[in-house]
Amino acid sequence: DGAPLTGRTITFSQYKDGLVRGGGLDRNAELIVRRDLGILPPEELERRCRSLGAELLPSNADFCARFDFAPRYPVWLKVWFADEEFPASGRLLLDESAPHYLTIEDAVTVGSLILDQLTGAQHWAV
Protein backbone atom coordinates (compact mmCIF):
# COMPACT_ATOMS: atom_id res chain seq x y z
CA ASP A 1 0.00 0.00 0.00
CA GLY A 2 3.03 2.28 -0.18
CA ALA A 3 3.38 2.79 3.57
CA PRO A 4 6.68 4.54 4.31
CA LEU A 5 9.34 3.10 6.61
CA THR A 6 8.86 4.35 10.16
CA GLY A 7 12.41 3.89 11.40
CA ARG A 8 11.03 2.01 14.42
CA THR A 9 11.80 -1.69 14.68
CA ILE A 10 9.59 -4.54 15.84
CA THR A 11 10.15 -8.20 16.52
CA PHE A 12 8.32 -10.85 14.54
CA SER A 13 6.07 -11.53 17.54
CA GLN A 14 4.99 -7.87 17.49
CA TYR A 15 3.80 -8.30 13.91
CA LYS A 16 0.04 -8.17 13.37
CA ASP A 17 -1.18 -11.70 14.25
CA GLY A 18 2.44 -12.66 14.96
CA LEU A 19 2.27 -13.91 18.52
CA VAL A 20 2.48 -17.62 17.68
CA ARG A 21 4.42 -17.88 14.41
CA GLY A 22 6.39 -14.68 14.91
CA GLY A 23 7.24 -15.59 18.48
CA GLY A 24 8.50 -18.94 17.28
CA LEU A 25 10.84 -17.28 14.82
CA ASP A 26 12.01 -14.80 17.47
CA ARG A 27 12.94 -17.66 19.81
CA ASN A 28 14.58 -19.64 17.03
CA ALA A 29 16.59 -16.62 15.85
CA GLU A 30 17.83 -15.99 19.40
CA LEU A 31 18.90 -19.64 19.67
CA ILE A 32 20.70 -19.57 16.31
CA VAL A 33 22.52 -16.35 17.21
CA ARG A 34 23.56 -17.74 20.61
CA ARG A 35 24.61 -21.15 19.27
CA ASP A 36 25.92 -20.41 15.76
CA LEU A 37 26.27 -16.80 14.66
CA GLY A 38 27.29 -15.06 17.87
CA ILE A 39 30.33 -17.27 18.34
CA LEU A 40 31.73 -16.57 14.87
CA PRO A 41 34.62 -14.16 14.47
CA PRO A 42 33.04 -10.79 13.53
CA GLU A 43 34.86 -10.85 10.19
CA GLU A 44 33.23 -14.16 9.26
CA LEU A 45 29.76 -12.96 10.20
CA GLU A 46 30.39 -9.82 8.16
CA ARG A 47 31.49 -11.93 5.18
CA ARG A 48 28.38 -14.08 5.38
CA CYS A 49 26.06 -11.10 5.68
CA ARG A 50 27.71 -9.21 2.83
CA SER A 51 27.49 -12.32 0.64
CA LEU A 52 23.71 -11.97 1.00
CA GLY A 53 23.85 -8.28 0.07
CA ALA A 54 23.55 -6.91 3.60
CA GLU A 55 24.77 -3.48 4.59
CA LEU A 56 26.55 -3.13 7.94
CA LEU A 57 25.28 -0.29 10.10
CA PRO A 58 26.31 1.39 13.33
CA SER A 59 24.13 0.21 16.19
CA ASN A 60 23.80 -0.26 19.92
CA ALA A 61 24.65 -3.93 19.20
CA ASP A 62 28.16 -5.27 18.58
CA PHE A 63 27.10 -6.10 15.02
CA CYS A 64 24.20 -4.90 12.90
CA ALA A 65 23.42 -5.88 9.31
CA ARG A 66 20.45 -4.73 7.24
CA PHE A 67 19.10 -7.06 4.58
CA ASP A 68 16.92 -5.27 2.04
CA PHE A 69 14.68 -8.20 1.21
CA ALA A 70 12.34 -6.08 -0.93
CA PRO A 71 11.70 -2.38 -1.48
CA ARG A 72 10.53 -0.96 1.86
CA TYR A 73 11.12 -4.31 3.57
CA PRO A 74 14.41 -4.23 5.50
CA VAL A 75 15.32 -6.93 8.01
CA TRP A 76 17.98 -6.20 10.62
CA LEU A 77 20.20 -8.75 12.32
CA LYS A 78 21.57 -7.44 15.62
CA VAL A 79 24.19 -9.47 17.47
CA TRP A 80 25.91 -9.02 20.80
CA PHE A 81 28.94 -11.32 20.74
CA ALA A 82 29.74 -13.74 23.56
CA ASP A 83 32.25 -12.70 26.18
CA GLU A 84 33.54 -14.08 29.48
CA GLU A 85 30.37 -13.07 31.34
CA PHE A 86 27.54 -13.49 28.85
CA PRO A 87 26.63 -15.81 26.00
CA ALA A 88 26.01 -14.33 22.58
CA SER A 89 22.56 -12.90 21.98
CA GLY A 90 20.70 -11.21 19.20
CA ARG A 91 17.58 -11.01 17.11
CA LEU A 92 16.06 -10.30 13.76
CA LEU A 93 14.01 -7.11 13.57
CA LEU A 94 11.64 -5.55 11.05
CA ASP A 95 10.45 -2.03 10.38
CA GLU A 96 7.14 -1.27 12.05
CA SER A 97 5.61 -0.80 8.58
CA ALA A 98 6.39 -4.42 7.57
CA PRO A 99 2.82 -5.72 8.08
CA HIS A 100 1.70 -3.39 5.27
CA TYR A 101 3.72 -5.51 2.83
CA LEU A 102 3.80 -9.16 3.93
CA THR A 103 1.65 -11.43 6.08
CA ILE A 104 3.21 -12.93 9.20
CA GLU A 105 3.56 -16.24 7.38
CA ASP A 106 5.55 -14.59 4.60
CA ALA A 107 7.59 -12.56 7.10
CA VAL A 108 8.55 -15.75 8.97
CA THR A 109 9.62 -17.28 5.65
CA VAL A 110 11.85 -14.25 4.97
CA GLY A 111 13.45 -14.47 8.41
CA SER A 112 14.03 -18.20 8.17
CA LEU A 113 15.56 -17.89 4.70
CA ILE A 114 18.04 -15.32 6.02
CA LEU A 115 18.94 -17.51 9.00
CA ASP A 116 19.30 -20.61 6.83
CA GLN A 117 21.58 -18.80 4.39
CA LEU A 118 23.74 -17.37 7.19
CA THR A 119 24.19 -20.75 8.86
CA GLY A 120 24.21 -22.97 5.79
CA ALA A 121 21.62 -25.14 7.49
CA GLN A 122 17.89 -25.50 7.85
CA HIS A 123 17.22 -24.67 11.48
CA TRP A 124 13.70 -23.53 10.83
CA ALA A 125 11.14 -25.55 8.93
CA VAL A 126 8.88 -23.24 6.98
What are these regions (language model features)?
Residues 96-126:
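Long, compositionally biased interface segments
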Residues 55-81:
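Amphipathic, interaction-prone secondary-structure segments
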Residues 15-62:
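Negatively charged, low-complexity tracts enriched in Asp/Glu with abundant Ser/Thr
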